[in-house]
């Protein structure tokens, strides 16, 4: 199973909105077929592995084999036929599954179907490692929203910029290059209008070989983005704006952006948190993304938007690149209100630490949410 999980990593950038899945077929102690899920609408991992095995040996030789799959095979018709039927047709003796699929269209049905066909099924093998491959897909199935990961580059004293806003560059080139991988695996790279106006970023994937670019999205309540912004380079851009009637000038601006810049304007209601309606409802933003089959959201934003997602309890993971620098007075990663008691602090759990060049990459996540997803795939 560990080998199958490693194989699934080769599909890290291409499967969305489907999960990243790999399958190994083992016969007489050796791997005779392998495959991983391709782009949406193409073969899933099980079908790829079966085709690979049949290219090496007679189809009848698959009878009695063992299938190792990182996710329960699908049991429904979508862009492709059900994989469980292809597996059953091979008449394996055993199917070993890393995790159950919480998708309501599957949800254990494939396991039951294989057992009814006389196949021994084992599940829950390296489930947490398999979950780490697909936090976005599992989150969308279990919590009805994508997995949101905030990427932060900071100094040892947790400053993301000088007091005047200068931030290029706190971290070194190796850390910045490593960050491209996390953009590439995401479905959406999200930022706020403040970052766009201050830095004019591209927010695209560079220095990583990938067949697709994630959608770039901007929280822009007042719809003040410059039509000449660098991120309008032909690839899709989604703009989340306040749900209100646009002025005539704004309507013309929207038409130009849609027709000439491949942009989409998405109207979102204002938040009513704490009785104030000054910002977009970020839960509505996340619901829209989930409805559009977005699995992983990569947030690269300033202190205020970081704080807004954290306070809305929507930040699932923090990816922090810490440079061995001490800045002193400067801008914090989160523009949070002061706490009255330490017990009010938002608690996350570190799960990975990695030296990247001269900097350190720290990864922390919401442990409660992670455990809820782990429980859903282990039932």
Report the location of each language-model feature.
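Short gly/pro/ser/thr-enriched loop/turn and capping motifs at secondary-structure boundaries
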Residues: 102-105, 128-129, 197, 224-226, ...
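Short, basic/aromatic recognition patches
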Residues: 1-16, 140
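Conserved histidine-centered catalytic loops in small-molecule metabolism enzymes
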Residues: 337-379
């Amino acid at each position: 199973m560990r080998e199958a999980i490693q194989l699934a990593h080769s599909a890290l950038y291409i499967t969305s909105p489907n999960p990243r899945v790999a399958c190994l077929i083992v016969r007489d102690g050796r791997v005779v077929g392998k495959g991983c899920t391709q782009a949406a609408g193409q073969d899933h991992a099980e079908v790829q592995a079966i085709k690979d095995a049949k290219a090496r040996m007679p189809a009848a030789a698959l009878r009695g084999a063992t299938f190792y799959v990182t996710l329960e095979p699908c049991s429904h018709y979508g862009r492709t036929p059900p994989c469980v039927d292809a597996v059953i047709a091979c008449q394996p003796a055993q199917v070993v599954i890393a995790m159950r699929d919480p998708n309501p269209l599957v949800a254990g049905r494939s396991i039951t179907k294989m057992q009814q066909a006389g196949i021994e099924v084992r599940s829950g093998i390296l489930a947490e490692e398999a979950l780490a491959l697909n936090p976005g897909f599992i989150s969308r199935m279990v919590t009805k929203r994508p997995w949101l990961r905030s990427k932060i580059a900071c100094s040892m004293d947790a400053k993301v910029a000088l007091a005047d806003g200068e931030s290029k560059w706190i971290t070194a080139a190796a850390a910045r290059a490593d960050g491209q991988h996390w953009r590439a695996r995401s479905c959406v790279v999200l930022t706020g209008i403040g970052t766009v106006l201050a830095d004019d970023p591209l927010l695209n994937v560079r220095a990583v070989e990938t067949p697709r670019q994630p959608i770039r999205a901007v929280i822009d309540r007042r719809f003040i983005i410059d039509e000449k912004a660098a991120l309008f380079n032909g690839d899709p851009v989604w703009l989340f704006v306040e749900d209100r009637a646009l002025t005539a000038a704004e309507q013309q601006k929207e038409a130009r952006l849609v027709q000439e810049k491949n942009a989409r304007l998405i109207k979102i209601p204002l938040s009513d948190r704490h009785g104030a309606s000054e910002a977009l409802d970020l839960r509505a933003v996340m619901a829209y993304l989930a409805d559009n089959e977005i699995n992983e959201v990569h947030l690269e934003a300033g202190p205020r938007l970081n704080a807004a997602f954290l306070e809305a309890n929507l930040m699932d993971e923090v990816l922090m690149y810490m440079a061995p620098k001490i800045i002193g007075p400067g801008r914090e990663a989160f523009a949070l209100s002061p706490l009255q008691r330490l017990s009010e602090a938002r608690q996350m759990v570190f799960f990975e630490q990695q030296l990247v060049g001269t900097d350190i990459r720290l990864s922390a996540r919401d442990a409660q949410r992670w455990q809820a997803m782990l429980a859903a795939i282990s039932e």
